[in-house]
Amino acid sequence: MDEWVISENGLRYKVDFGKKQNSGLFLDMRYGRGWVQAQAKGKRILNLFAYTCGFSVAAIAGGADHVVNLDMARAALNRGRENHRLNDHDLGRVTFLGHDLFKSWAKVTRSGPYDLIIVDPPSFQKGSFMLNKDYQRVLRRLPELLEEDGQVLACMNDPALGPDFLIQHTAIEAPCLRFEQRLENPPEFPDARVDGGLKALVFKAEGLSRTGWA
């Protein structure tokens, strides 16, 4: 297996090209990382299912005050630390939590509230996450974690589920979140069906107060 360092939007990431299914960076999420970098200045950000912390690297580069990364895979989070170090980032502005989200809401809540929450789960993770039933469990907890005018970047890459899955379930589970836009995907990753490709959807909190619903 070969380890490489690549550059994207002026930032450096370690990737593995070889026998692993995942290289260490989802290249089709380039526009998503760019969007986060552009939004990040002065914000507290929660990065759920953080993997190797690509969103976190982009956020710190964009001037985020602090990023909390959560992922069950501690080896992936260790790679995330390496990615931050590659870019000479201050690790005092980054937290790494190697936990199961559904057993760690208290830890996540203590570090909030957040101005931006990124949700980018796997379609399936044996024993811990099934997208078509567990995404709803995440969505319903987002309002209690968000600042009053907070944003959510909700991502999904299951070809069997279109963007309406996220839009409709967000309306049910977190009605204070208004759908704003779907980010475009990079042209080097064309999809035979647009709805079957990567979905990165932006939502904005409305009518939310820090003590509950306004």
Describe each region flagged by the PLM.
Residues D149-M156:
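Conserved beta-strand signature within the Rossmann-like core of class I S-adenosyl-L-methionine
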Residues Y135-E148:
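A short glycine-rich, Lys/Arg-flanked "PGG" loop and its adjoining helix->strand segment in the class I
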Residues H66-D71:
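Conserved SAM-binding motif I beta-strand of class I
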Residues G42-Y51:
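Conserved class I S-adenosyl-L-methionine
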Residues T52-A64:
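Conserved SAM-binding loop of SAM-dependent methyltransferases across substrates and taxa
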Residues M1-F26:
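Non-catalytic substrate-recognition/targeting regions of SAM-dependent transferases
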Residues I167-A214:
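Class I S-adenosyl-L-methionine
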Residues M72-I118:
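S-adenosyl-L-methionine
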